[in-house]
UniProtKB/Swiss-Prot annotation:
Its EC number is 4.3.2.10, 3.5.1.2. Residues 1-199 form the Glutamine amidotransferase type-1 domain. The gene is hisH2. HAMAP family: HisH. This is Imidazole glycerol phosphate synthase subunit HisH 2. The active site is at 76 (nucleophile), 177, 179. Heterodimer of HisH and HisF.
Length: 199
């Protein structure tokens, strides 16, 4: 079973529809035991770092997520929450992946938030990359990003480079929305769900 963490009341229709198309058995949940028993865990996120961390704390999930051994995927804000710290609201995050979510630099031709399609530049071979290449585009909506590349699987160029896909151990992050990224996003989600679970 796939646990989709739902602590914020956000509209998760696009993500759940994508999982349905992939034939995944999933549950929207904030129950610690259900999350711990899941084969894969997805942490979506819309809003601010403070609201995201507050919601996780109020539901008693911070230590639960930190001790998971199965694959965990953070999407958009969910990826940023996996990091050590976010400049947005100056708030400590889960600390599962080294790095800081920093505000993107705005330029005349590169407004912030970064909204729209952009392509991935894969840095390391990964099971997530199977069936994909550097000509593939995905859909972004964000103002903050991980600029460091220590654990980057894929990077993206938007006036400055940032990490688009990150991995450390069983913790994965995608700064873009795979569920809104057409066929490429479906391949990425399917590749994640195909990762072996150690739960």
């Amino acid at each position: 079973m796939i646990a989709v963490i739902d602590v914020s009341g956000n509209n998760l229709t696009s993500l759940t529809n994508a999982l349905i198309r992939l034939g995944g058995h999933f549950a929207l949940t904030h129950d610690a035991e259900e999350i711990q028993k899941a084969s894969h865990v997805i942490l979506p996120g819309v809003g601010t770092a403070r609201s995201g961390m507050t919601a996780l704390q109020q539901n008693g999930l911070i230590d639960v997520l930190r001790t998971l051994t199965q694959p965990l995927l953070g999407i958009c804000l969910g990826m940023q929450l996996l990091l050590e710290y976010s400049e947005e609201d100056d708030i400590p995050c889960l600390g599962l992946i080294p790095g800081v979510a920093e505000l993107l630099k705005a330029e005349r031709n590169h407004p912030v938030p970064h909204m729209g399609w952009n392509n991935l530049h894969w840095q390391k071979t990964s099971s997530l990359q199977q069936g994909l290449n550097n000509s593939d585009y995905v859909y972004f909506v964000h103002s903050y990003a991980l600029k460091a590349d220590n654990y980057a699987l894929a990077r993206c160029q938007y006036h400055e480079e940032f990490t688009a896909v990150v991995k450390k151990g069983n913790f994965y992050g995608m700064q873009f929305h795979p569920e809104k990224s057409a066929n490429v996003g479906m391949v990425l989600l399917n590749n994640f769900l195909s990762l072996e679970s150690t739960c």
